[in-house]
């Protein structure tokens, strides 16, 4: 496992949850003796929606909503067997989407 790399991508709508989860992952990886790069903040995706408030007239009256998607990237450069076991047992928040890629 010494020449492999683990890339972890996190997505969330809440920036506090994603920062807390990324901190847990980094602490777990460092505790098991792996070298960690990150968390790297990726660009925030902002989706905006405009909705008419009136069903008939008053085109100028609109409500505006937005959804922000926060992303973080963590690279574990030299993972050990303990690192992989600890990451599998790690319990993260429900609002965070985790994608793990071995490379």
From Swiss-Prot:
UniProt-listed GO biological process terms: translation
GO cellular component: a single term: ribosome
UniProt keyword Ribonucleoprotein, yes or no: yes
SMART domains named in the record: Ribosomal_S10
Tree of life domain: Bacteria
Keyword list, A-Z: Ribonucleoprotein, Ribosomal protein
Annotated Pfam families: Ribosomal_S10
GO molecular function: structural constituent of ribosome; tRNA binding
Cited function: Involved in the binding of tRNA to the ribosomes.
HAMAP family according to UniProt: Ribosomal_uS10 (MF_00508)
Family label: Belongs to the universal ribosomal protein uS10 family.
PANTHER family from the UniProt entry: 30S RIBOSOMAL PROTEIN S10 FAMILY MEMBER
Quaternary structure annotation from Swiss-Prot or TrEMBL: Part of the 30S ribosomal subunit.
The name this protein goes by in its record: Small ribosomal subunit protein uS10
Source organism of this protein record: Acinetobacter baylyi (strain ATCC 33305 / BD413 / ADP1)
Originating gene: rpsJ
């Amino acid at each position: 496992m010494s020449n492999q790399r683990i890339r972890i991508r996190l997505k969330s709508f809440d920036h506090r949850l994603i920062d807390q989860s990324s901190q847990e992952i980094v602490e777990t990886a460092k505790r098991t003796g792996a070298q960690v790069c990150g968390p790297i903040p990726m660009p925030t995706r902002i989706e905006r929606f405009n909705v008419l408030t009136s069903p008939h007239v008053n085109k100028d009256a609109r409500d505006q909503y937005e959804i922000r998607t926060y992303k973080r990237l963590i690279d574990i450069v030299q993972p050990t067997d303990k690192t992989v076991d600890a990451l599998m047992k790690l319990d993260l928040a429900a609002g965070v989407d985790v994608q793990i890629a071995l490379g």
